[in-house]
Amino acid sequence: MTKRTSAKYKIDRRMGENIWGRPKSPVNRREYGPGQHGQRRKGKLSDFGLQLRAKQKLKGYYGDLTEKQFRRIYAEAERLRGDTGEFLIGLLERRLDAVVYRAKFVPTVFAARQFVNHGHVTVNGQKVNIPSYRVKEGDVIAVRDKSKQLAVVLEAVGLAERDVPDYVDADHSKMTATFVRTPGLSDVPYPVVMEPNLVVEFYAKN
């Protein structure tokens, strides 16, 4: 198992949930966290604990973002007028690696980050290798011709465990995807419950 795959499943174990809905997640087989103390029964979380957990789960889902990365995105959402939690979700879903994942060009969000980093993707015909690149409505994301037959791409397209959401218009025959619109929380096909409202509460108090 690669370090990247190990890190992904460690997040699942830490959260106690299969946050990406993967069949091989270890939490499908056991109900405790990682490490030697993982089998201890967890007590009821405080309000702070619930807020922290909501933040950690959302950070983890998008590839285990660093606190600095996540806090910067949150600060941008907070500056917008309206529902900060909804804006936070929209900004996260506009990351290029998130769109590559949603389009089913790759099997995991971790693979999406690596795929973009290695220069396999274009946006409106121009190569972009920055996973955090902010996609706009109408942008066309494509897998470069030389990358279309990579095993990771062929595996992802055939995955039955998740569908492409309606805010991404993917054409797998051409390996292109148009970002149609910025989604809200109810539009995003999270396999588990995400609570951006608790993330807002966390940052309001800390």
Swiss-Prot record:
Gene Ontology terms, MF aspect: rRNA binding; structural constituent of ribosome
Identify the residues that the record assigns to the S4 RNA-binding domain, covering every copy.
94-157
Q: Which GO terms describe its biological process?
A: ribosomal small subunit biogenesis; translation
**Which CDD domains does the UniProt entry name for this protein?**
S4 (cd00165)
Keyword Transmembrane in record: no
Domain of life according to the entry: Bacteria
- Role played: One of the primary rRNA binding proteins, it binds directly to 16S rRNA where it nucleates assembly of the body of the 30S subunit. With S5 and S12 plays an important role in translational accuracy.
Write down the NCBIfam families for this protein, in alphabetical order: PRK05327.1, rpsD_bact
Q: Write the protein's name.
A: Small ribosomal subunit protein uS4
